[in-house]
Structures are given as structure tokens and as C-alpha cells.
From Swiss-Prot:
The modification N6-acetyllysine is found at K54, K57. The chain crosses the membrane at residues 8-24. Keywords: Acetylation, ATP synthesis, CF(0), Hydrogen ion transport, Ion transport, Membrane, Mitochondrion, Transmembrane, Transmembrane helix, Transport. Coiled coil: none annotated. This is ATP synthase F(0) complex subunit 8. InterPro entries: ATP8_mammal, ATP8_metazoa. It comes from Ceratotherium simum (White rhinoceros). GO terms for biological process: proton motive force-driven ATP synthesis.
Amino acid sequence: MPQLDTSTWSITIVSMIITLFIMFQLKLSKYSYPSSPELKLTKTPTHTTPWESKWTKTYLPLSLPQQS
């Protein structure tokens, strides 16, 4: 069985990493970021649900002893 020649693997891996780094740098350089970020006021919508206006009784779990 012939031996696998791995002498070119290192240059292939290094060139691939450099190429990926350059591509990511080019991709990230296309974004424009604001010079001074400002807070954006967001209004949270209020949802009314039927159970919010009703009174509900909270019961103790059955495992706890009764308090008198």
C-alpha cells in the first residue's frame, strides 16, 4: 500500500487560514457602525389578560401542615 504524501498539507492549511482571515476582514469592513450610539426608547405594549383583573386565591400545598 503506498504511503500518503502529507508534505503539502501544512502550506495548504496555512494558506486556507490566511484566505479565510482576509475574507472575514473584508466582509466585516463593509459594515458601517454609528460613531456615537444612542439609546433608543422602546415602548412596551401592555396586554390585558382576563385573569389580571380577577382575584385568585392561593392555596397552600397539601404537604404543608395547617396553620391555625
